[in-house]
Each structure stands twice: as C-alpha cells, then as structure tokens.
C-alpha cells in the first residue's frame, strides 16, 4: 500500500468522479483508475461502485476511509516533526 494510493483514494471518495479526482492529484484519469484497482486488489475488496458518470463508496470503502485519512494525517505529522523539529498537536 502506497501513500499515493491512500491520497488518491481519499480524494476520489470526496469527489466521487475519476476525472475530478485526477485533476486534484495532478495526474490523468487512467492513473487514478490504476491506483484504485491496485489498492482494491491489495485489500481484496471493491472500494467503489462505478456508475456511468460517478462512483460511490462501497460499504468496505466507507469502513476503510477513516483509516486512510488517519494514516495520511499521521504521516504528515511525522513529516512535519522531522522537518521542522516540532511535535504533532493533539492526542
């Protein structure tokens, strides 16, 4: 599991559209699709239901989202702590 995949997953969960998610992560739609498919393969479950012009989180996607968000937040806090010598705020 890669940080980029988690970030793309979280953005797609917000946008519910592959094209808009690709724009937000500064890549092409096919890369977003590939990252999500790889993440789904690693987790062994589908995270999104793909519809004609949008996607919806599956039950598994809803369960996974808070963990992905927490992982990204923890990584960013760790990055700041190392880069700037500060401790993360909060519990």
For each predicted feature, which ranges?
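Short helix-boundary/capping micro-motifs
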Residues: 12-28
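The N-cap/first-turn positions of alpha helices
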Residues: 2-8, 29, 61, 68
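A short LG(V/I)-centered, amphipathic sequence patch enriched
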Residues: 40-57
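Core residues of bacterial helix-turn-helix
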Residues: 24-25, 43, 64
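A short, exposed helix-loop element centered on a Lys and neighboring polar residues
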Residues: 75-83
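Interdomain hinge and pocket-entrance segments immediately C-terminal to HTH DNA-binding domains
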Residues: 84-91
């Amino acid at each position: 599991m890669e940080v980029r995949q988690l970030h793309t997953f979280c953005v797609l969960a917000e946008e519910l559209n592959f094209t808009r998610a690709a724009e937000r992560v500064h890549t092409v739609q096919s890369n977003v699709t590939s990252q999500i498919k790889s993440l789904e393969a690693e987790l062994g479950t589908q995270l999104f239901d793909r519809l004609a012009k949008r996607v919806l989180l599956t039950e598994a996607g809803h369960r996974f989202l808070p963990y992905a968000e927490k992982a990204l937040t923890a990584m960013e806090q760790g990055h700041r702590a190392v880069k700037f010598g500060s401790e993360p705020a909060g519990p």
